[in-house]
């Protein structure tokens, strides 16, 4: 039996009102654009005097020149960068192979020296 009367019972909250009575949320994007003129286009920004536009997941310069560098020059530099990365990978592979060959020849020379020392010792005993 509780000391202070009835057990705790909060009063019931009133039901929520409908958030929106308009049917805009039920319209698809193309219908909204036609009916309401909500054609936003792709996002654009101006950064350091350069106008950029977001298309297909990438920011692209709207003008042909990007910060004083031509698009063809950028593509050429990217291709050259790719070639240099591939050459770098090939050279790393060659260095690894040469290190393996060096360690193998070093191990063989140590074995030969050991056998030679054993032969010298056995020859002195006879």
From Swiss-Prot:
Tell me the Pfam families matching this sequence: Chibby (PF14645)
Annotated tissue distribution = Widely expressed. Expressed at higher levels in heart, skeletal muscle, kidney and placenta. Also found in brain, lung, liver and testis. Significantly down-regulated in thyroid and metastatic uterine tumors.
According to its UniProt record, where is this protein located? Nucleus speckle; Cytoplasm, Cytoskeleton, Cilium basal body; Cytoplasm, Cytoskeleton, Microtubule organizing center, Centrosome, Centriole; Golgi apparatus
Q: Which stretches of sequence are listed as region Disordered?
A: 1-26
Q: Which residues form the signal peptide?
A: none
Biological process (GO) annotations held by this record are:
canonical Wnt signaling pathway; cardiac muscle cell differentiation; cilium assembly; fat cell differentiation; floor plate development; negative regulation of canonical Wnt signaling pathway; negative regulation of DNA-templated transcription; negative regulation of Wnt signaling pathway
Where in this protein does the record say Phosphoserine is found?
9, 20
Record region (Minimal region for the interaction with PKD2)? 60-112
According to the UniProt entry, the coiled-coil residues are: 67-125
What's in the GO CC field? centriole; centrosome; ciliary basal body; cytosol; nuclear speck; nucleolus; nucleoplasm; nucleus
- In this chain, composition skew of type Polar residues spans 1-10
Documented effect of changing residue 91 to A: No effect homodimerization, nuclear localization and interaction with CTNNB1 but a slight reduction in interaction with KPNA4
A GO molecular-function term, please? protein homodimerization activity
Q: Which InterPro entries match?
A: Chibby_fam
- Renumbered to this chain, region (Leucine-zipper) spans 77-98
- Which keywords fit this entry according to its UniProt record? Cell projection, Cilium, Cilium biogenesis/degradation, Coiled coil, Cytoplasm, Cytoskeleton, Differentiation, Flagellum, Golgi apparatus, Nucleus, Phosphoprotein
- The answer to whether UniProt assigns keyword Nucleus to this entry is yes
Q: Quaternary form?
A: Homodimer. Homodimerization is essential for nuclear localization and interaction with KPNA4 but is dispensable for interaction with CTNNB1. Interacts with polycystin-2/PKD2 and GM130. Interacts with the C-terminal region of CTNNB1. Interacts (C-terminus) with TCIM (C-terminus), TCIM competes with CTNNB1 for the interaction with CBY1. Interacts with FAM92A; this interaction facilitates targeting of FAM92A to cilium basal body. Interacts with CIBAR2. Interacts with KPNA4.
Q: What else is known?
A: 'Chibby' is Japanese for 'small'; the gene was so named for the RNAi phenotype seen in flies.
Entry similarity comment:
Belongs to the chibby family.
User: What task does this protein carry out?
Assistant: Inhibits the Wnt/Wingless pathway by binding to CTNNB1/beta-catenin and inhibiting beta-catenin-mediated transcriptional activation through competition with TCF/LEF transcription factors. Has also been shown to play a role in regulating the intracellular trafficking of polycystin-2/PKD2 and possibly of other intracellular proteins. Promotes adipocyte and cardiomyocyte differentiation.
Q: What is this protein called?
A: Protein chibby homolog 1
This protein's encoding gene: CBY1
